[in-house]
Design a protein with these regions (language model features):
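A beta-strand signature from Gram-negative outer-membrane beta-barrel systems
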Residues: 96-145, 156-158
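Gram-negative outer-membrane beta-barrel transporters
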Residues: 379, 465, 572, 577-583, ...
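Outer-membrane beta-barrel signature, preferentially recognizing the C-terminal barrel domain
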Residues: 239-263, 267, 446-448, 496-511, ...
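Transmembrane beta-barrel wall of Gram-negative outer-membrane proteins
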Residues: 150-181, 185-224, 262-273
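Surface-exposed extracellular loop regions of Gram-negative outer-membrane beta-barrel proteins
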Residues: 227, 425-435, 478-489, 508, ...
Length: 812
């Protein structure tokens, strides 16, 4: 196996000596999109399986409709596949999107929660899943699956084959999947998936093995956009979507996302001794991900829910009534009129397009190398150490996907406020007034590069009464921007390579467990971690320039939890108290500011948040066929200081406002602070399983805008009612959701062979409760007249009662 070792060492060396240019994509206005298609609707709970923490499974598969994330901290999960963390510090590369619908290719080796010790790696997040694609872990045979759903997909097909040879022969695991949702059959519009995966593994002499995995998923799907409550009322639809419209008599969905990134990984493992193992992993992902949407410049806003077009904008009650009646009788007016848009483009004297369908492209090269060494000293002491090198390079540009009956589109920056300078609008001053044709690139053209080297070591001791572990990690992150266009706004700072930005990070954690008896024990986990910023935080707006974001400090997190556990034969009880603090949080937003009559950058820095609460759960087995799971959780997630902020004009980065934000004691999370969950799983017969889960969620804050809560604005308000209407944060009403699933297996006889068939049915929101999945304040605010209702809240609602049906045939 000398050639395998040589290959790994060569690629490790290559990754290390490469020049390290860091990247990160532009931070644009957040697009609030709830993507129902990402949920696993055909999941059926595993009956009578004791999890370390039932909160994770209940919240993940049943509580997402409330944005229920245990302990309140979003985006705090990670997934390690074959020893590789594919997550990137750069925007534009969504690793999980690259295997959408392909979860069957993975086998879970381990999962740790609350930063507990793992022999598979070092976790810095609330929950880390360690997955493998090794063909050795799948049973030999064929699996054929078909499914139907009115939420995630209309139809799905999967074929899975695993071939297991002799010990020293190659083993194969292969997987094919397709999903299809025709236009208009889901709130997001459409969905198309074609994916394939192949995994090869071979055992060699001297306890060595090598494996190769390739997955390739081509997915495109629509995205649902939020809207104000008024349009939901006018449309009489709980899943109203303003981002689609009619084109030549057909439904047209321009708001979408796609992925086309093949991912290759190679793994090598060797047992050096009976007590030590080394694992080496290499990975490479090369391809393209992106989004598309309707764009426009120098013309009227085409969005049907634009505030000036709605009845509420009129001050005349008679006019409002007439508009309400008109929308009631003309529901097509609540969708985009693409036929009208085409006429406007055609009517242009020069045949210039004012409206286009734009595609935001991220051209991705992502390389990974990692090593893990595990050592068992004796029956009491063990340790593991590892390193991962991550190198990402992403090229960002726009492509005109559809000119909508026009002949060209000017390569202008439509977000610029006219300052009288002739070159301000130019995206590329070397090609001024460039006419872009369909399929050609336009707009920002830049590259971001990043490199991270992460290392860690962990030690664990087990004794009859005590267990403890401790771990230390250190990482270095590097970022750089490279601009390929010289735009008219930032002539001296848009073209060429930026300064190389370097950020170290370090952290430690510890775990102590005391066993009162074989059934009862107490555990405490504590940690302190310094995180490096990602590229979106480092650069203010890399699409235009390489200026660094203000308030750039390392993110600091520390915390502790204390838990009590009882593990009986028929009952399992958990009670946990936790406290976590986060410092130097930052936020950045691009929006239009009425007071300055300009697009601006809003930057928040040195924000501090506290997450604290109690978690409890009970599992018990009744009558030998019924498992009952209950959970009650209460938390308090709040901002603990008044952070700093700045407002910078987009045209020239001139600071027009700065100071403090009055955010102290306001909510730090949008998930519910109070949750109660009950799950009943029954097995009336050996082949039949039934599950019913109900979740009650309360004290759930909306997502709110920080910048209108500045001391600069609020301290001038003498009227308490006006002050409260702007400063205070609204909470959503407490609600309840009921979900259910049913599975049945039967055996067909074919000669002497039995062929098992598995059927499963899952139902979400059985009571069809109208649940707002997402509610947020718009970034646009009336800073002049301080009218909080001028730009009302935007909503996305749950789809209501949804189902998924799956049938699987297995031949061994």
């Amino acid at each position: 196996m000398w050639f395998v070792r040589k290959l790994f060492l060569s690629l490790f060396f290559f990754l290390i000596i490469q020049s390290v240019y860091a990247q990160n994509e532009e931070e644009v206005t957040s697009q609030w999109v709830y993507d129902e298609n990402e949920r696993t609707y055909n999941w059926v709970p595993t009956l009578l399986k004791s999890n370390k923490n039932i909160l994770s499974s209940i919240s993940q598969f049943n509580g997402y409709v409330f944005n229920w994330i245990p302990r309140g901290q979003s985006y705090n999960n990670s997934t390690i596949i074959d020893g590789i963390n594919w997550a990137s510090n750069l925007n534009g590369w969504n690793a999980s999107f690259s295997y959408t619908g392909m979860y069957k290719i993975f086998h879970q080796k381990e999962s740790d929660e609350n930063l507990e010790y793992s022999s598979e790696g070092y976790s810095k997040n609330y929950r880390t899943s360690y997955l493998t694609t090794s063909a050795n872990l799948f049973r030999k045979g064929w699996q054929f699956h078909t499914g139907f759903s009115n939420a995630s997909y209309m139809n799905e097909g999967r074929i899975q084959y695993s071939g297991a040879g002799n010990r020293n022969e190659w083993r194969l695991h292969s997987f094919l999947v397709f999903q299809n949702t025709p236009n208009g059959m889901s709130p997001s519009g459409f969905k198309k998936i074609k994916g394939a995966a192949f995994s090869f593994d071979k055992l060699f002499y001297n306890n060595q093995s090598i494996g190769i995995t390739l997955w390739w998923n081509q997915t495109s799907q629509g995205k649902q956009a939020p809207s104000v409550l008024e349009t939901y009322t006018l449309s009489h639809q709980r899943n109203y979507n303003p981002s689609w419209g009619w084109l030549d008599g057909q439904a047209y969905y321009p708001n979408s996302k796609y992925t086309n990134v093949p991912v290759l990984s190679i793994r090598y493992e060797k047992n050096w001794t009976e007590r030590s193992t080394v694992q080496l992993n290499l990975g490479l992902a090369v391809g393209e991900q992106g989004t598309s949407q309707l764009d426009w410049t120098s013309t009227t806003d085409p969005r049907p829910d634009y505030y000036r077009y709605l009845p509420s904008y009129s001050k005349d009650s008679s006019m409002r009534s007439q508009l309400n009646n008109w929308f009631e009788s003309n529901p097509q007016a609540l969708q985009i009129n693409f036929d009208r848009i085409q006429k406007i483009n055609k009517a242009s004297v020069s045949k210039r397009s004012f409206y286009i369908i734009n595609k935001n492209v991220a051209d991705i090269i992502s390389a990974r190398a990692s090593a893990l060494y595990k050592f068992q000293l004796n029956n009491y002491w063990s340790a593991n150490a590892g390193v991962q090198i991550a190198r990402d390079k992403i090229h960002y540009f726009n492509v005109i996907d559809n000119l909508l009956s026009g002949e060209f589109f000017y390569n202008y920056n439509g977000w610029v406020i006219d300052d009288g300078l002739i070159n301000s609008f130019q995206n590329n001053i070397k090609s001024p007034d460039q006419k872009i044709k369909e399929g050609e690139r336009w707009g920002p053209n830049f590259e971001l590069q990043s490199m991270q080297v992460l290392s860690w070591v962990q030690i664990k001791n087990i004794s009859p009464r005590w267990e403890f572990s401790t771990g230390l990690n250190y990482a270095t992150d590097l970022f750089q921007r490279n601009g390929y266009n010289q735009n008219g706004l930032f002539i001296n700072n848009s073209l060429g390579r930026s300064t190389l930005f370097y950020f170290p990070s370090i952290g430690y954690k510890g775990e102590v467990l005391y066993k009162y008896s074989g059934r009862m024990y107490a555990r405490s986990i504590f940690f302190n971690q310094q995180f490096a910023p990602n590229a979106a935080t480092v650069f203010l707006d890399p699409s235009l320039h390489s200026f660094q974001t203000p308030f750039l400090l390392p993110n600091l997190k520390n915390g502790i939890d204390i838990s009590l556990y009882y593990r009986g034969v028929n009952a399992k009880i958990m009670l946990s108290a936790y406290f976590q603090k986060e410092k130097n949080e930052s936020q950045k937003r691009f929006f239009y500011h009425d007071r300055y009559n300009s697009f601006v950058y809003g930057i928040v820095g040195q924000k501090e948040s506290i997450y604290q609460g109690l978690e409890s759960s009970v599992e018990t087995l009744l009558f030998n066929f019924l498992q009952l799971e209950m959970s009650f959780n209460i938390g308090h997630y709040f901002i603990s200081n008044n952070p700093l902020y700045e407002i910078l004009l987009a045209n020239d980065i001139y600071k027009v406002e700065s100071g403090l934000l009055r955010l102290k004691n306001l909510p730090a999370a949008t998930g519910p602070e109070i949750t109660e969950a009950v799950s009943i799983q029954m097995q009336p017969t050996y082949t039949t399983r039934i599950s019913v889960t109900g979740i009650y969620a309360a004290k759930r804050a909306i997502s709110y805008d920080y910048y209108r809560r500045s001391a600069f604005l609020l301290d001038k308000i003498s009227d308490q009612t006006t002050y409260s209407s702007i400063h205070n944060v609204s909470y959503l009403p407490a609600q309840f959701v009921l979900n259910a699933s049913f599975s049945k297996s039967i055996n067909l006889k074919y000669g002497k062979q039995k062929i098992p068939i598995y059927c499963n049915f899952s139902f979400k929101n059985l009571l069809s409760t109208l649940i707002p999945v997402l509610v947020f304040e718009q970034s646009r605010f009336d800073y002049i007249n301080l009218n909080p209702t001028k730009f009302p809240l935007k909503y996305l609602f749950d789809q209501g009662l949804t189902y998924a049906v799956g049938i699987q045939l297995q031949i061994q």
